[in-house]
């Protein structure tokens, strides 16, 4: 029975150490947050002042894709034979 008690005691100590280690790492993760200065001024062109900028245009215009059920991406499937053996 003493081996079982020692094993339980060891597991409790190991869990406590793991919890302390994880909680210390959580504080470091919270500190690595990107703020507004890190993001810069956005996608504006250099030298673009107020009122002198061309209008924004999307890089890739949206086009709705084709669904597989509509079969518009490839040839039609082969026709089924009329007689099934």
Curated annotation (Swiss-Prot):
Comp. bias regions, Pro residues: 75-85
GO molecular function: hormone activity
Annotated keywords: Disulfide bond, Hormone, Secreted, Signal
Signal peptide: 1-31
Annotated compartments: Secreted
Keyword Aminoacyl-tRNA synthetase annotated: no
Disulfide bonds: 48-53, 66-72
Any one GO BP annotation for this protein: calcium-mediated signaling
Pfam families assigned to the protein according to its UniProt record, in alphabetical order: RALF
GO CC terms in record: apoplast
Spans annotated as Disordered: 60-85
Function: Cell signaling peptide that may regulate plant stress, growth, and development. Mediates a rapid alkalinization of extracellular space by mediating a transient increase in the cytoplasmic Ca(2+) concentration leading to a calcium-dependent signaling events through a cell surface receptor and a concomitant activation of some intracellular mitogen-activated protein kinases.
Record family assignment: Belongs to the plant rapid alkalinization factor (RALF) family.
Identification of the protein by name: Protein RALF-like 28
Source species: Arabidopsis thaliana (Mouse-ear cress)
Lineage: Eukaryota, Viridiplantae, Streptophyta, Embryophyta, Tracheophyta
Gene name in the database record: RALFL28
